[in-house]
Amino acid sequence: MSRVLYFAYGSNLDPEQMASRCPSARVAFLARLADHRLDFTYFSTRWSGGSADVVRHFGESVWGIVYQLDAAELQRLDRFEGGYQRVFLPVRDDQERSWHVISYEVPLKRSFRPTHGY
């Protein structure tokens, strides 16, 4: 089966949550998304507040986890990431090696207060 690399930030940093969403997910490495910052641009009715998103911002970085998972599970992840769209992003690992990975961003960004979970 084909495997893909997925850059997680926000609530998907929680290994229990990722395991429930994508049982095949395994931590591959820590990574940094350059020239972005973390913001809360999507209102989650499930969490009753703003959910994390990555927003372009020169000079800042967002750290996350790159998981390796079965490509077949991407459709499951798409459903969980309902208000987000799948994107391809360049990240760097802690050895400064470059990787192109799948992640999710909010297409229509607004500003919300983060949920209490953050």
State each model region's role.
Residues 1-118:
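Glycine-aromatic micro-motifs
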